[in-house]
Curated annotation (Swiss-Prot):
Its main location: cytoplasm. Its EC number is 6.1.1.20. It comes from the Bacteria. SUPFAM superfamilies: Anticodon-binding domain of PheRS, Class II aaRS and biotin synthetases, Nucleic acid-binding proteins, PheT/TilS domain, Putative DNA-binding domain. It comes from Symbiobacterium thermophilum (strain DSM 24528 / JCM 14929 / IAM 14863 / T). One of its GO terms (cellular component) is phenylalanine-tRNA ligase complex. Residues 406-569 form the B5 domain. Residues 39-150 form the tRNA-binding domain. The gene is pheT. Belongs to the phenylalanyl-tRNA synthetase beta subunit family. Type 1 subfamily. This is Phenylalanine--tRNA ligase beta subunit.
Amino acid sequence: MRVSYNWLKDYVKVGLSPQELAERLTARGVVVENVVRANPGVEGVVVGRVVAMERHPNADTLWVCQVDVGGGRVLQILTGAQNVTVGALVPAAVPGAKLPGGVTMGVKKLRGLDSHGMLCSEAELQVGDDADGILILPPEPGLEPGMDVAEVLGLNDWIFELDLTANYAAHCQSMLGVAQEVAALVGGEVNRPSTYTPDAPGTDVRNLIAVQIDAPDLCSRYVARVVRGVKIGPSPLWLQARLRAAGMRPINNIVDIANFVMLETGQPLHTFDYAQIRGQRIIVRRARTGERFTTLDGQERVMDESVLVIADAERPVALAGVMGGEDSEVTDQTADILIESAHFDNINNRRTSLRYNLPSEASKRFTKGVDPSGCVAAADRAAQLMAELAGGTVVAGHVDVCPRPAVPPVILLRTERANALTGLKLTPERMAEHLRSLGMAVLTPADLAADLALGAPESDEEPGEDLGGHPVWTALHQVSPVPSDPVVYRTWAEAAWAEVEDAGSRLEALLGGGESDGKAAASGEGVSPGGASDGILVVVVPTRRSDVAVEVDLIEEIARCEGYDAIPLELPVLSSHRGGRSRQGEVKLAARRALAAAGLTEVLTHSLTHPRVYDMLALPEDDPNRRCLALANPMYEDRSTLRTMLLPCLLDVVRYNANRQVRDLAIFEISHVYRPVEGEQLPDEPLMIGLAMTGNLAPLGWNSPERPADFFALKGVVEHLLAELGVPDARFERSAHPSLHPGRQAALVVGGKPVGLLGELHPQVQERWELPGRVYVAELAFAPLMEAMLPQAVYRPVPRFPAVTRDVAVVVDLDLTAHRLETAIREAGGDLLEEVRLFDVYQGERVAEGRRSLAYRLVYRAADRTLTDEELEPVHNRVREALKALGAELRS
């Protein structure tokens, strides 16, 4: 934001140089990125009056002008501009004058005639972009030939370029907001401009325009005023200078006044040609789906119900807070002006601005936050200036529709807590001084008790009546403008008194009463002038300070007013107790290390996705994973719901890499998914482990072939993870998940409960995701694995005695799983059986159809002796008998 130093001095006595002011503002948190001269290098250019002109005898496109440049001098200056007329006041760069870029003017011969300097355009003075004609200065009292153009155009100024952070974006996006900060800095007062304009007798504005708000959630206030009989023309030079200093281009007096008031107060305004408002009615409503509207830039906009529009009785006339329409814009023929001063929802306004790519100073302010209490004052200021600068007559009264009046918050500040948090040692009086300098009202608990003891003011009181006897109630009327409309005021008064009562309840709770309905505070109990309440300040915050909502916000304001440099340097008091990870954190780290050791790369994916991914995964309509949480206001269509699975996110990563010729990939992610819970407001957020492998796991080498990813490689990674975590009693069972290949998938079961799936991606799912090769995926629930882990690792000493190996081969039916066979072998082998390994599988012509041959290697060992054949043979026979019991045929 650009702030003019000269303009700032209209509102506050600065008393500091521009550079010093910039440094001190930055130290208070209002960051001044740069201080630059407003003058781009214009020196010696004066105001000239064209007293005579004629065509150049040797050039049809040139004019020979006689220009009065003051001091009794009339110079001959030649120009090719076609907008110059006799009597026009123009910038004349006389010999010796300097223009931006370091050009020094002299006498130059053009087609045989001398030109003593030149007449300047906006572009040549670098005060605008218009290079087609000479800058014509509007005739004003006191504007005479010979005056310094830099002074006339307001170029002898300094410009502060502010970088407003979120804490200052709302209240510092106006000249008065910055002036309040400067006043607090230098200990002065803000000189707010008067908005008084005598209303024209006769018609009331309510007889000329009616306002209806059909979308109160998107528009909390709409104020309208009417000014009749205006004359459209150029703005006075002082107003043009103010706009240029702020980086805006002057257009005409009506548009310039609206922009000036926005820059001064922070409240965006819009002006309509009153004659074009059909039915003399304004309706603030949502657009209808498919409704069309042509904005001021000539573009037709197609709208839907998410767009807020300002409409008359027949059609939209503006995109609310963004841009007006062609049909109601102010033109040179406009005589009557309808002024709009409203408060629109910041999120909806930003979304509309982005949707139609219509950034503007108005939408920027609505997005960051505008004071809803300032609507009437801004409309009055604009009406005043239109009467003064455009010759208009202000119609009496306002139309003020306000379904949700803004009430200044009442915040309780504990002074001891403020000192404890900041490290400062300020008195309550010093804190109150800082807060009052920012336009806040500071009272005592006794004042609040007095309000509550007196009770609510009479409901028929009007704003401006005597408010004596109610200190906090009076402050609520003073820190921000209150509604002038009686109906709106009564609504405001109810909400304001509710704020007073709530403050009383909070005060009683602070003084030790716990939860309260405020009755004790109302009677004055525990709120005496002395005692515990001495350390509490009751602060009423203006509505323009939307960033100050709770106690710590006040503490921040006190700290920056006192100066961050005043905060003492103290080492923090550290606890001797060392922090550590939670058990979940430890297990998660162990899982990450195990998967990384297995050769997988960790990825982090976005937790937002789109419901169509579940169609791509071929999930049935009743699958629980389709029940996902949708965002109320998604920024992007593809990021509209919270994920219920990691699988689609991992497939997105595989596709992204494949599109960039990375076909060999092994990745994992350990992240949360989000699943709605029936009857609960918040979802379940289980932690999941996701794996994905594709391409080759090992490249082609001089001594080894490529090793492509397959189901068993994926299964091996899962087994490695289980072993590293110490998860016993895990097995793999057949499964039938629709996203996976029907013959190459399995369910992981731990402790008799399914905890995950693994397998090859179904070919149709692979095709929908446009993946070039086979992809192997797994998704495991983290919590059941953590619960099943052994409490601690069991140490086994290095074996001292040799092992004995025996092989056993069996022929079994195809439906008898290897897991059942291995379980039977281990149970029969007992403590002496150390290892069971399947080393051969055969299915072919030497084995009957429907059967297969499995060969196992069994390793036996005793911890305290060498096993003999006599000891081993009975154990091995038990293994054979156990296999026979399952229907296995032993092979020799």
